[in-house]
Amino acid sequence: MKFTKMHGLGNDYIYVDAISQKIENPNEISKFVSDRHFGIGSDGLVLILPSDVADFKMRMFNSDGSEAEMCGNAIRCVGKFVYDKKMTDKSTISIETLAGIKVLEMTVENGKVVLVKVDMGEPILKAETIPVLSEKHPVIDEEITAKDYCYNFTCVSMGNPHAITYIENVEEFPLEKIGPLFEVHEKFPKKTNVEFVELIDDSTVKMRVWERGAGETLACGTGACAVLTASVLKGYVGRKATVKLLGGDLIIEWNEKDNHIYMTGPATTVFEGEIDI
């Protein structure tokens, strides 16, 4: 299997052209290649496939083998993958995902993609669609308790569920202890990604994320979009803000005209190779 390892702000996946090669049992392959000791090492596997409704189709799998709807960092890399490999000559393309069709605008320098702006679509605020068990609409400051920990969560879906809460010091927060408790909380029928956010100023927030099925990662694009949405809903920031993640910064904008969230950030190729599976 030929592959390319890429990352968006350190959120790394193994990318495979599944148009020119047949990939069977991607769930197991993802578990294998993701292993940082016995595999290649990544947060998961991304397949680029043909699409009947868009330029390309993306399927992505977490390091535990589960399939995910969408990943903002991964989709930026998909744009770079197909452009840099001359699978397309368009700098604006559409990608089919389980969370719908996403449109990417790519900034190209010297024939290579350096930045990708993604139309992430409208944030979903309806409790049953997120899904979260709540009577509120939108779900702002829903008090949720797990063991001895209690937080007020604002819940948003960007095609995948996110629960966002605000804390004083995100760097020193014991995420690996508390994140998993809320990821699998009964309030979230499909589990959830959990974001802990520190407010820096009215145009900057800093976050750490516990990703559903992957644990803490250096960055989560849909998480950054959900955090911006929650922060606007709570009146903390304006409609355009810098979201600081462990792996770097994303610029997120909630456009008032079309109600869509736009995410701009880098995409980086690490190396290419071939592996027996």
UniProtKB/Swiss-Prot annotation:
It is found in: Cytoplasm. It comes from the Archaea. InterPro entries: DAP_epimerase_AS (IPR018510), DAP_epimerase_DapF (IPR001653). The keyword Cytoplasm applies. GO terms for molecular function: diaminopimelate epimerase activity. It is an enzyme of class 5 (isomerase). The active site is at residues 71, 220. It holds the Pfam family DAP_epimerase. The record marks 162, 211 as: Could be important to modulate the pK values of the two catalytic cysteine residues. It catalyses: (2S,6S)-2,6-diaminopimelate = meso-2,6-diaminopimelate. Belongs to the diaminopimelate epimerase family. Homodimer. This is Diaminopimelate epimerase. It comes from Methanococcus maripaludis (strain C5 / ATCC BAA-1333).
